[in-house]
Swiss-Prot record:
Protein name: Non-histone chromosomal protein 6
Biased composition (Basic residues): 9-20
Top-level taxonomy: Eukaryota, Fungi, Dikarya, Ascomycota, Saccharomycotina
Main location: nucleus
GO cellular component: chromosome; nucleus
Length: 103
């Protein structure tokens, strides 16, 4: 039996995406992201006209072939960036707490 077409439909309210605070610190990059940022242009130069998705795939394959010793500089950068993020996040939360107390 078909439903009555004139019956009101229930609609679900969408809450939407929460706006990101522009003053919030940027997230820390992983070792792979540092590697990808350093090597993306070289992959594009070696393969002119390569599609965006294929660049990521090539970077992933190249990352997998690296030895642990070759990954060390990227892991050190990631560790330093993680510390930077944690420090900035702590300062941001402290400032947010002070701002909330003032209101």
């Amino acid at each position: 039996m078909p439903k009555d077409a004139s019956a009101p439909r229930r609609t679900r309210k969408t809450t939407g995406k929460k706006k990101k605070d522009p003053n919030a610190p940027k997230r820390a990059l992983s070792a792979y992201m540092f590697f990808a940022n350093d090597n993306r242009d070289a992959i594009r130069a070696d393969n002119p006209g390569i599609a965006f998705g294929q660049v990521g795939k090539a970077l992933g394959e190249k990352w997998k072939t690296l030895t642990d010793a070759e990954k060390v500089p990227y892991e050190e950068k990631a560790t330093a960036d993680k510390k930077r993020y944690e420090d900035e996040k702590a300062a941001y939360k402290a400032n947010a707490a002070e701002f909330d107390e003032e209101e």
